Every structure is written in C-alpha cells, then in structure tokens.
Design a protein with these regions (language model features):
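N-terminal hydrophobic alpha-helix used for membrane targeting or insertion
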Residues: 4, 16-19, 64-66, 115
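Conserved ATP-binding module of the ATP-grasp superfamily
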Residues: 1-8, 59-62
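Conserved metal-phosphate-binding beta-hairpin within the catalytic cores
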Residues: 8-33
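Catalytic cores of soluble metabolic enzymes centered on carboxylation/carboxyl-transfer
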Residues: 33, 37-209
Length: 209
C-alpha cells in the first residue's frame, strides 16, 4: 500500500526496526537488497526476474495474496577481510571451494585464480541456508561454513563460524550491538563492523525482504 500511495512500480525494500515486540518503519529503498536471496528462498519467487519484467512493462503473474512464507533462511556475507581486525584482504585467490548440500545457495563471482581488487566493496560471496525452521537453517549454515575453502586471502568465514557456535545467537533475540559486545569493539557504528555482522535471518514472523 505504501508503494501504491506514491505510485512506485518496481522492486523495492521496506526497512523496519524491531524493538519490544513492535516493528518501526525506517525507510524504503528503491532497489533489491543484498539479502534478497533470503526472501527468494522462503517465498520461491525470483525477485530479480520480477524486477526485469516490471521494467519491461509486464504485469506480475501473482498478487500479494499468492505469496506464501515457507521455512526460514539465513544469509552470511563472506568478505575478503581479516576476521579479527576487519581490514581488507585483497589479492589472488589460490583456491576456492564453495559449499553445497540441501538448502544451500551460494552467490559468488569467486574462482581459483581470481584476483580480489582493493578498489571495491570486500563482499566476495553470499552463502544462504534454507530449512523448514530456524534450527534447520542454522545447522545447514554451520555445515556450509565448515565446507568453505579460500586460500590466498583472508575472509570473515571464521567470524561467522564463531557466531553460529554462540548459544545466544542460536537462541535468537540478539540485537544490533551483539557483535560489539561479543568482540569488545569500541566503535559499534563503524561501517566495517556493521558489514561483518551479516548472519541475518528471516522467517514468517520477520517481514523485511
């Protein structure tokens, strides 16, 4: 209804903050977010294809009432950076092995022999795990993180592994300051630290796309 009110016709993302059982609207981004695979896995809808069809003047073959939420999905952003200091780690990739298995999706441009440049964002891969519930998604993600092999550069994969082993994260209910407290960081709002906390999950009770 917000998009219809302003006459917007394309893919977009409405962002909310969750506090004390309530959702608070922040903003709308007129683009698809990095986390869009989470939405695609729990709805079965290809958002990029839908956006291209809209741009070409086509109508969507479904309505909001047709969209059903199935299961839970979690995404980890794999960055080419030191997992402790968050400093960039560009350079040649001597070996790259992507994880696989049931419910695992990997979006990446990495390959063995690729040279990670120092000029752009450090994101080199997205690993997404989908399962019938949060516990299943977490278990699959933990296996996927253990399967990742990257040699030649540093990545934040060890940080993700540590987060998924932490009982507080597995139990849910962590907030935006979780990583700050966990690692004893002094600057909770610094951009590299914000990007590092990328294990964001969505289920039928979390409306953000």
């Amino acid at each position: 209804s917000a998009c219809a009110e302003i006459g917007y016709r394309s893919a977009g993302t409405l962002e909310f903050l969750y506090q004390d059982g309530e959702f608070y609207f922040i903003e709308m981004n007129t683009r698809i977010q990095v986390e869009h695979p989470v939405t695609e896995l729990i709805t079965g809808i290809d958002l990029v294809k839908a956006q291209l069809r809209l741009a070409d003047g086509e109508r969507l073959p479904w309505t909001q009432d047709d969209v059903q939420i199935r299961g839970h999905a979690i995404e980890c952003r794999i960055n080419a950076e030191d997992p402790k200091t968050f400093t960039p780690s560009p350079g040649p990739v001597k070996l790259w092995h992507a994880p696989g298995g049931p419910g695992i999706r990997v979006d990446s441009h990495l390959y063995t022999g690729y040279n990670v440049p120092p000029y752009y964002d450090s994101l080199v891969a997205k690993v997404i795990a989908h399962g019938e519930d949060r516990d299943t998604a977490i278990a699959r993600m933990r296996n996927a993180l253990n399967e990742i092999v990257v040699e030649g550069i540093k990545t934040n994969t060890p940080l993700h592994q540590e987060i998924f082993q932490h009982a507080a994260f597995r139990a849910g209910g962590t907030d935006i300051h979780y990583l700050e407290r966990r690692l004893g960081l002094k600057e909770p709002d610094a951009e590299p630290q914000r990007r590092a906390m990328t294990a964001g999950g969505r289920s039928g009770t979390f409306p953000r796309a």
